[in-house]
């Protein structure tokens, strides 16, 4: 127990990855039960982090540091704040529900999901940029395997487009990481890739700009930001159901997390200088993504563009530079992960029953599957930001925070979100209450949800409603992380490095 308490965060990172290796030696049937047990234990470990997290304490918590290759600044350094903590929780919840949902190819999915869970735990808690980048890149492999092995039409093309876009963009970020590591050595006489050390650096104006661009490109493709999103409809719609869940609920959050952890605190001045073009890009995501979703004939592609559109609201919250907006963005990242998981699982059930996702083929499903229709409606309403649902809270806070920064664009973004209600409710009407084409027997005898599907979706609905009615459970620790981030951004904006060193220690963000 003493070891677990001292190294809890490391256990959270490596336990699912090591457990995934053991699944190689199990049968298909046994691997599913095994994966459920491992994912449940992992969730309990994350809840231990939650229980031990002190919202009154500034700085990183559960911090662990081990020197590995000191000469080149490669150290194992992990820790969490109020922002990272909830992405760990989201990761644990999504993976547990996913392994429970798995219906076929259980062994392959169990291994990929557990591997990805551990890798993402590493992404959200790594404070050494070499480890962060390693986890960031390795996360591509399990998802690429799921798309290429179990995807729909054009799965190879979709997988390769996803891989090449994200891998090549990440190389830009790698160049920036290596440059800053060497720049730190020039300033302090030793190399460091520790993000908390980097907060002490001041970059020259010319170098600062290209470093900002290098990081932004690597991050933008992962979210993805417009116009670097063209891999998204292929990957999301052609991946198997759980592949789509991983991409939309978890991997997209890597990008917005990197904005908060790296881009804003390292380059606060440039983040403010380029606020207007970035905000316009986010607004394009909301409007353009909404119109594209409205025109889709395939339900899964519609959900993909809906996800893309909602991530635009998250980006606006991130660049609000105030507690309300950033807290709203983090809350919405969590909410979006839960909601979009529900939508893709429901779409997957529809595809399993009918071998199609073409909206025009459906109709009158509510008559034969009223429980399925009810679940779909509740998740759909959360997606459009219905009050008292989890989708409303993050969206409202993000736009409220951005309104204080850029009122006109916030108003346009707020009114544009009406689009999501239009395309979601229109597609719902067509699928569940539209006229059924004659001879379509698969739809007329549509089987309602089974016990396992009801169980998984009930957990999603409980989260949607409980956290929508009582969001304070999440918002308190998130607010703590947002305030710390803003303190670092403000300090990094000071003109003199001497003041910067002193102030960082005063707010205790560097917690040695």
Predicted regions and their residues:
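C-terminal ends of transmembrane helices
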Residues: 19-28, 95-106, 145-154, 222-237, ...
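Structural signature of hydrophobic alpha-helical transmembrane segments
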Residues: 4-15, 80-91, 129-142, 208-221, ...
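Alpha-helical transmembrane segments of multipass membrane proteins
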Residues: 20-24, 96-99, 118-125, 145-146, ...
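Juxtamembrane/interfacial segments at transmembrane-helix boundaries in multi-pass membrane proteins
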Residues: 54-75, 171-229, 234, 259, ...
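Helix-coil boundary and interhelical linker segments in multi-pass alpha-helical membrane proteins
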Residues: 2-3, 121-129, 260-274, 314-331, ...
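Predominantly late transmembrane helices and immediately cytosolic-facing juxtamembrane segments
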Residues: 226, 340-344, 411-445
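Transmembrane helix-loop-helix hairpins at membrane boundaries of multipass inner-membrane proteins
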Residues: 1-8, 22-111, 194
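Alpha-helical multi-pass transmembrane bundles of energy-transducing inner-membrane proteins
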Residues: 29, 111-115, 119-207, 292-305, ...
């Amino acid at each position: 127990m003493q070891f677990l308490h001292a190294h809890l965060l490391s256990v959270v990172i490596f336990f699912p990855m090591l457990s995934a290796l053991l699944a190689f030696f199990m049968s298909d049937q046994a691997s599913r039960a095994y994966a459920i047990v491992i994912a449940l234990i992992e969730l309990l470990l994350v809840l231990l982090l939650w229980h031990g997290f002190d919202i009154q304490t500034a700085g990183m918590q559960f911090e662990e540091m081990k020197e590995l290759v000191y000469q080149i600044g490669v150290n194992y350094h992990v820790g969490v704040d109020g922002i990272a903590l909830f992405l760990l929780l989201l990761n644990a919840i999504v993976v547990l529900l996913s392994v429970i949902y798995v219906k076929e190819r259980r062994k392959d999915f169990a291994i990929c999901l557990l591997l990805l869970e551990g890798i993402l735990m590493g992404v959200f808690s790594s404070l050494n940029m070499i480890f962060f980048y390693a986890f960031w890149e390795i996360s591509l492999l399990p998802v690429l395997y799921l798309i290429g092995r179990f995807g729909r039409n054009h799965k190879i093309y979709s997988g390769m487009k996803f891989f090449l876009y994200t891998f090549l963009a990440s190389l830009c970020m790698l160049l920036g990481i290596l440059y800053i590591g060497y720049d730190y050595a020039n300033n302090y006489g030793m190399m460091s890739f520790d993000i908390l050390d980097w907060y002490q650096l001041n970059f020259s104006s010319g170098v600062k700009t290209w470093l900002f661009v290098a990081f932004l490109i690597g991050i933008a493709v992962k979210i993805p930001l417009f116009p670097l999103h063209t891999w998204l409809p292929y990957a999301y719609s052609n991946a198997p159901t759980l592949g789509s869940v991983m991409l939309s609920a978890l991997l997209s959050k890597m990008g917005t997390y990197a904005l908060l952890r790296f881009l804003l605190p390292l380059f606060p001045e440039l983040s403010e200088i380029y606020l207007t073009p970035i905000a316009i890009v986010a607004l394009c995501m909301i409007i353009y993504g909404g119109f594209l979703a409205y025109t889709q004939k395939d339900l899964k592609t519609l959900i993909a563009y809906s996800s893309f559109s909602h991530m635009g609201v998250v980006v606006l919250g991130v660049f609000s530079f105030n507690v309300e907006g950033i807290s709203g963005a983090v809350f919405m990242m969590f909410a979006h992960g839960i909601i979009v998981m529900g939508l893709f699982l429901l779409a997957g059930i529809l595809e399993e029953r009918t071998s199609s996702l073409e909206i025009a083929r459906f109709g009158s499903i509510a008559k034969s599957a009223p429980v399925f229709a009810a679940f779909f409606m509740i998740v759909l309403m959360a997606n459009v930001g219905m009050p008292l649902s989890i989708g409303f809270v993050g969206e409202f806070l993000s736009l409220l925070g951005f309104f204080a920064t850029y009122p006109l664009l916030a108003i346009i973004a707020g009114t544009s979100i009406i689009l999501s209600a239009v395309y979601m409710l229109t597609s719902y009407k067509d699928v569940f209450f539209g006229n059924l084409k004659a001879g379509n027997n698969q739809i007329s005898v549509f089987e309602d949800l089974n016990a396992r599907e009801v169980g998984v979706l009930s957990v999603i609905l409980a989260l949607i409603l409980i956290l929508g009615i009582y969001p304070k459970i999440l918002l308190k620790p998130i607010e703590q992380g947002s305030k710390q981030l803003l303190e670092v951004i403000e300090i990094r904006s000071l003109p003199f490095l001497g003041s910067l060193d002193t102030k960082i220690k005063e707010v205790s963000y560097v917690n040695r």
